[in-house]
């Protein structure tokens, strides 16, 4: 029997402080509880400037190097690591107040966000979230890059990265996942980059907050970092990005993801493809017959 999922928020307000990857400047992020049905909403507050941007597919304005949400005037960059933690906790309703245009990079993974949000406590609402179960294959392709979604009653990912580097040539992983496994096996994986690219970006005034404290940095033939959290940490981080991006659909999308050299653009394209078919014959929703017959109140979990 498939798991019944309910809308969730946090119990208490929690504050998170870090630096922006590109600006190198301090960022203050405050997560607030929100009523059921609110969704995940970023509230930008900087002096007299204010903006409210929901984490929705229609608000994705850029997928180059990171995922950016915007309203046509304001933007919030690098949302995927935070949203991956939100996804793993099953949170559906949050106000995320931020005083900068990019989410803090923290240690380059989702772990600090996970720990902060968990420390605030989780409350579960009586309203049900309906996962989407794929009945026929879906795919998005860009040259030699692809992301395929196959029918499966469990969440599963097969991911391959293939960089021109001896340690990242054909690095691959297949994992079956649930919320707890995502927390333990995916969210601690840090972002990665190549030393030559970091130096070029910093020469242009970008990646000013990048360091060995918040990224895996690869030299021509090895790692600058002394220790990895996983032997295949880089490909695991790509799965982290995938979940952060797919979460913007607003409902869990269950299936077997097959990815090769994919990234934010294909992740978002897949989420849009799924949601465009959500009322069609290709998609099976979580049917109402699985809703309990008794009335359920909000509970702390």
UniProtKB/Swiss-Prot annotation:
What domain of life is recorded for the organism? Bacteria
Q: Which UniProt keywords apply?
A: Hydrolase, Lipid A biosynthesis, Lipid biosynthesis, Lipid metabolism, Metal-binding, Zinc
Q: Name one GO molecular function term.
A: UDP-3-O-acyl-N-acetylglucosamine deacetylase activity
Q: Return the InterPro entries for the record.
A: Ribosomal_Su5_D2-typ_SF, UDP-acyl_GlcNac_deAcase, UDP-acyl_GlcNac_deAcase_C, UDP-acyl_N-AcGlcN_deAcase_N
Query: If you read the UniProt record, what top EC class would you report for this enzyme, in one word?
Result: hydrolase
Q: Which HAMAP family match?
A: LpxC
Under which name does UniProt file this protein? Answer: UDP-3-O-acyl-N-acetylglucosamine deacetylase
Q: Which gene encodes it?
A: lpxC
């Amino acid at each position: 029997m498939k798991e019944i999922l309910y809308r969730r928020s946090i119990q208490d307000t929690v504050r998170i402080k870090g630096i922006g990857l590109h600006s190198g400047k301090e960022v203050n992020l405050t997560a607030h509880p929100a009523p059921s049905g609110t969704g995940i909403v970023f509230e930008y507050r900087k002096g007299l400037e204010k903006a409210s941007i929901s984490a929705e597919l229609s608000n994705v304005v850029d997928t180059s190097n990171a995922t950016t949400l915007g309203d046509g005037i304001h933007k919030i960059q690098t949302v995927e690591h935070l949203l991956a933690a939100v996804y793993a906790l099953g949170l559906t309703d949050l106000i995320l107040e931020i005083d900068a245009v990019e989410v803090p990079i923290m240690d380059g993974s989702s772990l600090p966000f996970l720990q902060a949000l968990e420390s605030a406590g989780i409350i579960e609402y009586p309203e049900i979230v309906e996962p989407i179960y794929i009945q026929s294959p879906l795919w998005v392709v860009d040259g030699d890059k692809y992301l395929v979604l196959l029918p499966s009653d469990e969440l599963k990912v097969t991911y391959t990265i293939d960089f021109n580097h001896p340690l990242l040539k054909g690095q691959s992983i297949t994992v079956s996942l649930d919320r707890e496994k995502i927390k333990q096996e995916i969210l601690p994986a840090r972002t990665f980059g190549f030393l030559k690219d970091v130096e070029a970006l910093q020469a242009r005034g970008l990646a000013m907050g990048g360091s060995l404290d918040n990224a895996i940095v690869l030299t021509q033939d090895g790692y600058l970092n002394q220790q990895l959290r996983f032997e295949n940490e880089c490909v695991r981080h790509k799965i982290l990005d995938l979940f952060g991006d797919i979460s913007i659909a607003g409902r869990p999308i269950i299936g077997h993801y097959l990815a090769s050299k994919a990234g934010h653009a294909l992740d978002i394209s897949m989420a849009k493809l799924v949601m465009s078919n959500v009322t069609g014959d290709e998609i099976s929703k979580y049917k109402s017959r699985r809703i309990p017959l008794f009335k359920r109140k909000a509970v702390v979990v």
